[in-house]
């Protein structure tokens, strides 16, 4: 009989998988987990956390809505979070939802507002005094993207409210979508013009709102339905959800004609049946229906769980499915070496999209389904969006198929593929010697939220890595314009002959002869077009061509000069960005920000024993160990040294947070070391009795027992300390703990920032630094950087092309700073741009 998995380990595994799925779905726009699997994992995690409240954690996916906003637009902090909804997949779950509300409110047959669940992009529209002032995407629920300019192009969205009686501030929540007929007409037009067609209406809507050029958005046939409200200030709304929707309609917002008020579970299920039967004939895509308690007083009584309201639920439709054939199973290697199996499929049309690939998640999933090359499989776009292999049609399996096995070697670098004990994920052990991991590491390092190297695209990163010019991320800072020009000529040429013809135009004769000799050196017959190896580009790059001074009068150089300038600009960064850019496993933006806020100094962080990281809120054992493992690797420390040697500068270094004083103690250290049987109570008891790690090291269990520690705990601690690695860790951790305490100010000496408690708004374009960088530096000085101007705004920083925010600030008498004043202020307070 197999023992049940340890709840703590299972909870940790579930949190990792769900957070990874959140990141891929919300940030990368590369979903690799089916909605059905995601929902199943989330429900299992919720059940385990209810059963084991002692294992609850603030960084659990159950405590949040999603992940981070995408990075191309300014951030907007939602005044009221845009929460997600719980899901129901069966009649029984809907009935249970109604029962809970009935019992809590003591209402036998509560009324609900029922409405279709549109498959588009959720947004929040902010109106002040009846005028549209800002629009934002949902993002992670707390912070979204400012897409106001794009939303202004959507004709269904009123720029000024009709009628009268609206609140001074009104946030309207709704869905931007693309009607089916408009989607088909748009694609027909694009085909006729040879333009790019859209994959499906949902992607069309989401992609349109993320266009940096609002003129492109204006050409897309977008529409909008309102379904609720967010912040409401200085005004009143009706006390029923259905009445609020009617009021919104009167003020000029489109509201779906399919919204109905129904009673009890029978009414909800009947509505679900009707909408399901009408689904294919609707003018827009939906993936379910939404039920909301109609009475607002009842909504307030029911309240919320951390990530969803208790008074609303989404009843999802079954996913759409088709059968096809598995033509191959391949391995993709990610940034951290994760080896993810992917099914290559015979193309099949599923829910409006041609599917050729589907994730198989991991080796355990393949074994569970017994997926084999040649199998007929059921492909599902769960949630009508994400392709997955749902099942194998076993009776159609051809003879002679073989059960799939995880390769023992990385398909890219040949290193061993290994699986850590207790982990579902297999990983390439090659680390940064693996080109695939190196390329992913570079992509992450230069990304917008990391070092923000503008203009370095994925394809050119591949060329850089394949050429051998960049072996580590620090090598980016050694590149020259001439090297970039040479790489571009090689990578874009159709043949070595074409490359040489182009090169002859831009090189002196002596340099050209040297280049030609290098090409001949890889075995290319230049007498004709025959015998050209297919790998000539990679061979030529690996051969290490000499670098030439190219005639820049005859060759386009602006792109290369801009890229070198972007690399130079990225040298000046923040600790938060630098840590995130390193690509440490499990360390996302929020963790990097917390590390920066609590420790403040890279030199401190990179030499900190891993147990001390657990003193930072929301950093648990897994993340702390991951940090420790990363900084324990000599290669990683060498990479950091190279970056610093190449003039990468962290501009916001500061002393550790005074809040650490309340966290740093021997009792907490003994707990954080994760010694078997040493509970928090026992850790406090041992710390009180012995006072230091040194006092515990060589005495064995007897002194512990004499101090009242139970025999089993004493033996466990003594045995743990006998392991040399554990002993070294404990000693180093206490030494560093003492050093940290000595660095902290005494009580009452804590320094405050010059902008503590002040709200600042940034608008327009800044020349010397990005708005993100300005925001981070202002926050480092204590400011809260908001997305909209109010009477509480301390000052507004106005860059070039400042718009309505500047007008509003002037009308309210808010102090206005230009960029020069901002830069001077930052410089005076140690925040050089």
UniProtKB/Swiss-Prot annotation:
Q: Name one GO biological process term.
A: DNA replication
PROSITE patterns referenced in this protein's UniProt entry, alphabetically: BRCT, DNA_LIGASE_N1
| Key words, A-Z | DNA damage, DNA repair, DNA replication, Ligase, Magnesium, Manganese, Metal-binding, NAD, Zinc
Q: Which residues bind NAD(+)?
A: 35-39, 84-85, 115, 138, 175, 292, 316
Task: Write out the catalytic residues in the record.
Answer: 117
GO molecular function annotations of the record = DNA ligase (NAD+) activity; metal ion binding
Q: Which amino acids does the record list as binding Zn(2+)?
A: 410, 413, 428, 434
**Which residues are in the BRCT domain?**
750-833
User: CDD domains from the xrefs?
Assistant: BRCT_DNA_ligase_like, LIGANc
Q: Which InterPro entries match?
A: BRCT_dom, BRCT_dom_sf, DisA/LigA_HHH, DNA_ligase, DNA_ligase_AS, DNAligase_adenylation, DNAligase_N, NA-bd_OB-fold
The EC number(s) attached to this protein equal 6.5.1.2
- A GO CC term? cytosol
Catalytic reaction(s) noted: NAD(+) + (deoxyribonucleotide)n-3'-hydroxyl + 5'-phospho-(deoxyribonucleotide)m = (deoxyribonucleotide)n+m + AMP + beta-nicotinamide D-nucleotide
CC cofactor: Mg(2+); Mn(2+)
Q: Which PANTHER family match?
A: CHROMOSOME TRANSMISSION FIDELITY FACTOR 18, DNA LIGASE
The family annotation for this protein states:
Belongs to the NAD-dependent DNA ligase family. LigA subfamily.
As for what it does, the entry says:
DNA ligase that catalyzes the formation of phosphodiester linkages between 5'-phosphoryl and 3'-hydroxyl groups in double-stranded DNA using NAD as a coenzyme and as the energy source for the reaction. It is essential for DNA replication and repair of damaged DNA.
Give the protein's recorded name.
DNA ligase
